[in-house]
């Protein structure tokens, strides 16, 4: 029996809009939109008109759909956005249009990585939570990983960056102590560590961190201990239970905390479950740091071989699912000239 042929008249406006997007037919797409077609429509494959246009590199159709309010951050059943489709297919022009749309939207709305503290999972919840230490991970009570041993090579690279000029080093967020152990290898003049979780702080003392000659431990949330901080030659920031807004807030204090010519870096786990969203946030944070007077170099580090399925056994949430980690190295624009 032959399958039934669906005529254009029988197709919904949404299906026709997907078809126009696939064909790159901008005039038809605009006509359908003006007639009330839903730009956020998902077809039977779970794809939006914008995804179809992006997948095939129809840049003008991508622009028209975005101008009509098509959601740039909608996800397919395979967890891919329109930007992912254009990126994977090598459609550079469409990709750049979507990237700019994502950056502009996040500058204004911040819908992906920014969350309000009222929605739970805030730093306050974490600081009151019990944590569990094991040889290869630090976990909260929901079996979410606070820090894991696979990050060790990344932390060593971060330490190398922030210690490149020697002097006085600040780390915000001790976790398993991976980055601080690496920092110690460079024998900094002083090594200040800010840690807010009481159990992590206790473990630091138990394992001798309070007895190291060049180490100063400050217990508390970084927001509450700013008056105890000085200025540093290298700074690393990696807190758990905070959001992008907290990182942005910390960046506002860099002009006071980072000495001229100093190096700043942070754990770049922004949107670590989606490649395109991660690119958007790498660009966004670089742009916002530039507005504060800092240049950002993103150094690609392959991590695929570190992340077999066994790494995530017993962990409820894979906070990193990408093949490459982009390590940020930030320096004042004046100091790097």
Label every model-predicted segment.
Residues 28, 60-61, 93-94:
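Conserved ankyrin/ankyrin-like repeat signature
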Residues 245-331:
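C-terminal substrate-binding/active-site "lid" region of AdoMet-derived donor-dependent transferases
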């Amino acid at each position: 029996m032959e399958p039934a042929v669906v005529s254009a008249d029988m197709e919904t406006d949404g299906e026709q809009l997907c078809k126009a997007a696939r064909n790159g037919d901008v005039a038809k797409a605009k006509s359908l939109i003006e007639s009330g077609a839903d730009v956020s429509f998902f077809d039977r494959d779970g794809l939006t008109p914008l995804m179809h246009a992006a997948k095939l590199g129809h840049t003008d159709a991508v622009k028209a759909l975005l101008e009509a309010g098509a959601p740039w951050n909608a996800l397919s059943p395979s967890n891919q956005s329109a930007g992912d489709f254009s990126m994977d297919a090598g459609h550079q022009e469409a990709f750049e249009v979507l990237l700019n749309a994502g950056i502009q939207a996040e500058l204004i709305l911040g819908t992906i990585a920014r969350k309000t503290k009222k929605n739970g999972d805030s730093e306050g919840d974490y600081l009151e939570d019990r944590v569990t230490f094991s040889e290869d991970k630090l976990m909260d009570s929901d079996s979410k990983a606070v820090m894991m041993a696979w990050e060790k090579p990344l932390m060593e690279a971060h330490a190398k960056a922030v210690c490149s000029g020697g002097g006085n080093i600040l780390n915000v967020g001790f976790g398993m102590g991976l980055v601080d152990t690496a920092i110690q290898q460079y024998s900094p003049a002083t090594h200040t560590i800010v840690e807010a979780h009481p159990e992590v702080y206790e473990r630091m003392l138990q394992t001798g961190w309070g007895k190291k000659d060049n180490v100063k431990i400050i217990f508390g949330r970084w927001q509450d201990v700013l008056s105890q901080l000085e200025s540093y030659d290298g700074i690393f920031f990696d807190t758990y239970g905070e959001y992008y807004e907290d990182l942005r807030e910390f960046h506002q204090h860099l002009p006071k905390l980072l000495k001229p010519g100093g190096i700043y870096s942070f754990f770049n786990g922004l949107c670590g479950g989606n490649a395109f969203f991660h690119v958007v946030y790498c660009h966004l944070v670089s742009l916002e740091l530039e507005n504060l007077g800092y240049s950002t170099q993103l150094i690609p580090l392959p991590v695929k071989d570190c992340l077999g399925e066994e790494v995530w056994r017993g962990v409820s949430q894979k906070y990193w699912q990408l093949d490459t980690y982009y390590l940020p190295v930030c320096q004042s624009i004046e100091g790097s000239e």
